[in-house]
Amino acid sequence: MDRLRLLPMDLPTITVSTIGNTKSKSSFVRRLTVGFVILAVLGLLYVPAYHSAQSPFLGETPSPAESPGSLHSLASVAQLPGWSYNTSRDLCVYIHPGNTTSILSPTGICSLPPYLLIIVCSAVANQEARTAIRSTWANKYNLDNLYNFTVKVAFLLGQSDNDTLNNLIVEESSQYNDIVQERFLDTYNNLTLKSVMMLKWVMSNCDQTKYLMKTDDDMFVNIPLLLQTLHSKPKTETLLGSLICNARPILDPKNKWYMPKYMYSEKTYPNYLSGTGYVMSMGVASKLYQAALVTPLLHLEDVYITGLCAKRAKVRPVNHPGFGYGPRKMDPCVLRNAITTHKVNASNMYVIWIKVNNASVICNNRTRVDRKSITLSRSSRNAGYYVFKKKTINRLCAISIVSLWIISL
């Protein structure tokens, strides 16, 4: 009987405990729901930010079907064509720094030391592009007569596995005396070899040059504006171009810019200049060449030369708005204010040349800028590498902090 009396007295205690547990569970469910909602919002922000970071010019992105985990797994095992895990990346093996390795070399090009030497990296088969360049911005008459400084232009090529093409290069060299050909197979993954061969050849044949420019055969170079830029701001150490910051290696083996982890394991590349066109003083060229001889090869030429080698040589790459790695508006006043224009085929080389030199077009005193090119450049600081805008990262960080605070309530 005493026990029966005690039961009702214990019931309120049990009831209160149940209500407390119910409230606790309700609070936990609410926090969990809020957490899921915030994670969903983060996901919606993250996905467009990720995709907007891909190249607006080249459009090569990883397949949506591949998860980041699978890309990281593949990156540790997938071999880069021509540069497998066991392939030596010691440049001295290929460059032979103590020997002359060039098959073809222009004679007398630096008998009078140039103020500016432009080396155009060209593919063996791209004769039409070289002809267009010789007829426009590298026109020999203009180079010899119109500028207050000595400017020389030469084309750098590797070898083809097609003997017919190699024979045509010999004929072209005999006709124009402006071709440097080195002993390596001219492929995309050998572009670093090509640029280091450029440094070697210049150091051996044109070491009294004041400035060296490296560019490609799909580029229009505004030589008068480049000369004006170099002369107005002379520096003993110059490494100038379109600066790319905080770029991340691509881990998708199907991508053109795939970087296997056995070649580069860091999360980001050092700041570097777009390989479409950059200029250096000869002192810097010498430092970069010496750094390359002791830096393991990386097949991405611009990352290697102006990033890794520049970092080792303690040379800082500097951005200049006149350089760009995208196409520009075909506006004469825009083109006149651009040092380099990218993605120019042979026919457009003539079109741009005519527009730039059309005396009937008068540009006002204000510098006209290609806003579209700048917008593209800012939204994807490097064509082909994963980059996030600083503003987007700050937003994601802020939302993450708020999320953690709410969940902890």
Model-found features: residue ranges?
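Secretory-pathway lumenal glyco-enzymes, predominantly type II signal-anchor Golgi glycosyltransferases
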Residues: 2-409
